[in-house]
């Protein structure tokens, strides 16, 4: 019995120690905060548009493989049966020689293998065109994926702004509760009316309603961000406020749109070479074997097999009629891309200039906000003390508390706007 008692006691102590350690173990593994960089990475890897990269790779491989097969010998089978108005004959007779009469119905079934020579240039450029088209398509996807960064920035910093407003609204509630305590004390000593406390309580209810609205707004933003990045997020997910990025200059523009313009010009360059290839003479080797009547001996009226081979030259000069205009059209398209690129760079630099001006303005506002908060806080503390002794009204205190709250909210929003603008600036540059 004594042994059982000791054993049970030890089990109880072990269970108690385990329960005491559980909170500690939990506290040692906090849920990591969500970072802006991870949101960018998830949005770009999990968005449906990202699947187009793999599809482009597949189409590129198929197109290049099909184009490369143009270098293989071209096999052809054909047959014909003809009824002619005349046939080969010798218009004189030879003594002692009986020449056969060639039938006017003739038949031929043959197979031919052709190995192109000059067309190998066209094959090479068709392979290059497949790769160039795929590179241009990847650049288009890059442009669409890059636009996701601005959307992620908007939601991420929107949530941070809501959090700051909720934090400051909670601080406002604390100030109002402190004011209610001072007002109730003053009313208890007969130096203030009880309506002063009621006015503060009404203001407190309004602040709490504002917090409830902000919480609903946050849930909406978090749900939208979760859809965009393809992750399950809880309503109370924490966001890691990023540090202000290092300054970059407008000369460092690395937008994917610029790569798209270059890849499109590369496609035009390949098409220009293909246009030249199409108007060259075509030289090929060929071998043909068949069975027919007559075969190669036109004076033999029997069905026989035959074979022949050689080199073939053909040149379709009809393409030269439109060659110059087609070449000019490609040149116009290339110049159009240059104009579009210049216009894009101009618009981008204008956006960068506006963003840099906005960031400088926000830095000045944040500096002045700090001084405004210091003065508003001093006035509020003085009004709180006066409220307790009945020398200030509840409305006065509410006015000063709200003024300080607006100043703190203004500074918090200006800081977030500065951070948001800095990351938008990097996104505009192509980071």
Go through the PLM ranges and name each one.
Residues 6, 14, 28-29, 40, ...:
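Acidic, low-complexity, intrinsically disordered peripheral segments
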Residues 2, 6, 34-38, 62, ...:
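Periplasmic alpha-helical coiled-coil/stalk elements that build and connect Gram-negative outer-membrane
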Residues 65, 112, 274, 312-314:
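Outer-membrane beta-barrel architecture
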Residues 52-67, 144, 148-167, 221, ...:
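Amphipathic alpha-helical coiled-coil segments
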Residues 51, 74-93, 100-103, 114-143, ...:
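Small/polar (Gly/Ser/Thr/Ala-rich) solvent-exposed segments
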Residues 76, 110-112, 156, 308-312, ...:
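Membrane-embedded beta-strand positions in outer-membrane beta-barrel channels/transporters
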Residues 16-17, 27-76, 191-193, 229-271, ...:
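Bacterial Sec-pathway N-terminal export signals of envelope proteins
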Residues 21-23:
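N-terminal signal peptide c-region/cleavage motif recognized by signal peptidases
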